[in-house]
Amino acid sequence: MISTDALLEHHEKTNRSAQWEGFNQAFASVISTGLPSEEICHLFFRIGSRMAQTIHVERCDTLDELQIAFNTRLQAIGWGFSSLYVQGEYLFISHACSPLEGSFGPASSPEWTASFFEGVHQTWFESQGVTAGLRVCAETMNEPSSSQILLKFGKA
């Protein structure tokens, strides 16, 4: 039996665009030596937010509908999938199969991908009319070998 991690690793390696690899690695090298980590994360958050505005999610009434809407948009553009679940006072978002994971080479940080998806999901939640003061933030920073991003949505 093939492990889930092995399948995800294969998916991520085979679905990366070779035509962008050199550009992405050069971009990562330039920004990682020219900007503080906090500013890079803010940049990726803003890019995620802007992207979410271009792939708008319609109003949903239930968590299941929201998960379906998120995944419909993400899978249509080959950006993986999310699982939403409530635990305690928070809604957690587990995202897998992001094409960003590993696409920027050794100069990048898992925080960049997490920040990007913070921006995507924050914008989508805001489009649902969420209460002010609720934020999406990375629950844990992934190890470089991790294929999932865990985000938490709740009071800031």
Locations of regions flagged by a protein language model:
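N-terminal accessory segment detector
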Residues: 1-94, 99-109, 144-146
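Short terminal or interdomain "cap/linker" segment that borders an active site or interface and mediates
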Residues: 85-94, 131-156
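Long, amphipathic alpha-helical coupling/dimerization segments that relay conformational signals between
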Residues: 106-136
